[in-house]
Amino acid sequence: MDINSLLNIAAAAAKDAGTHLASFHNTRVDKEDGHDIKLRADKEAERVILDRLIPTGITILSEECGLLPAGDSNYYWIVDPLDGSLNYLRELPMCCVSIALWQGEESPVFGVIYDFNHDKLYKGIVGKSATCNGALIHVSTTTEKSKSIITTGFPVYMSHDEEGLARFIRILQDYKKVRLFGSAAMSCAMVAQGSVETYHERNIAWWDVAAGVAITIAAGGRADIEILDKERHLLDVFLSNSIITKD
């Protein structure tokens, strides 16, 4: 398996989808369900990506179409064609295309995130390096939680009852500042490039963070991942600069 060739395919797919999203701002809402929202744009971006990925013969898991089995290898394309759909709908410039290659459910190989609003392409191969538009990026060197920024969010499947919110607040209290960007993938990219020290979300979907996890690890960071619901692909994810700890 030629990882560099596959990375180039993923990067081209992300750029194609992002260019489409940036140039054709179709904001038709196909479905709203509680705290979730689906746009026609998600499906159109996914179609653009699948045209690139299907010929590779690797199984695809995408937020919109679900699982597309291919072959018998243990590799997966993990795709979120538009992460930050509500931001996109409201013209808040914090959304992106996210594509990752994983081996099984526990081993990220590489990730690609395209921030099409700012024309920034993040790439990272685990065990090698991470870049943004070709320039090397690295996680922060901050050593104290009290001087650190954590980014998080309110995932679709998060419990919004009193106990769930209290647990959420307890996690944040030790940090200097909290940022909610409305895009899990972009939050991960912020950790990878050293803009923030940590990212933590519970009940976040695999496709939301798969690329960001790979890029953060490639940039010198650490990922602590717990599978919460295998059928729905829900995780507890804590990314850090490898210095700041979860507890």
Task: Give the residues covered by each predicted segment.
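A structural micro-motif at secondary-structure boundaries
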Residues: C132-L136
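N-terminal subdomain of lithium-sensitive/metallo-dependent phosphomonoesterases centered on the IMPase/IPPase/PAP
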Residues: M1-L82
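Short loop->beta-strand "edge-of-pocket" segments that line small-molecule binding or catalytic clefts
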Residues: I137-S159, L172-F181
